[in-house]
Amino acid sequence: MKGLFLVVFLMWFVSQMNTEETEEYVQFNVIEDPYPRLPRRNYSCSTMACPARHICGCMPTPITPETPYRDLDCGCYHEYDMMPVCEGL
């Protein structure tokens, strides 16, 4: 009986260790912004509401010295010419 209790306790203990490791792994697996000085980009149209006669679209960003990689920037565009909507208007 003591052996069965010991086996059950050890199985529970190991499962708790695995749970804690998983939580720590998820906690430290946060992707940091490689360029924190730049404005944050929208990577999806799923949560974006655009005004009438506009559509949400994702355009590739230009490659610059500050951002030497291709990225996507999603936002509202005029539906007839795909020009970005001015933020202040």
From Swiss-Prot:
GO terms for cellular component: extracellular region. Expressed by the venom gland. It comes from the Eukaryota. Residues 1-22 form the signal peptide. GO terms for molecular function: toxin activity. Disulfide bonds: none annotated. Contains 3 disulfide bonds. Its main location: secreted. It is found in: Secreted. Keywords: Disulfide bond, Secreted, Signal, Toxin. Belongs to the scoloptoxin-12 family. This is U-scoloptoxin(12)-Er1a. It comes from Ethmostigmus rubripes (Giant centipede).
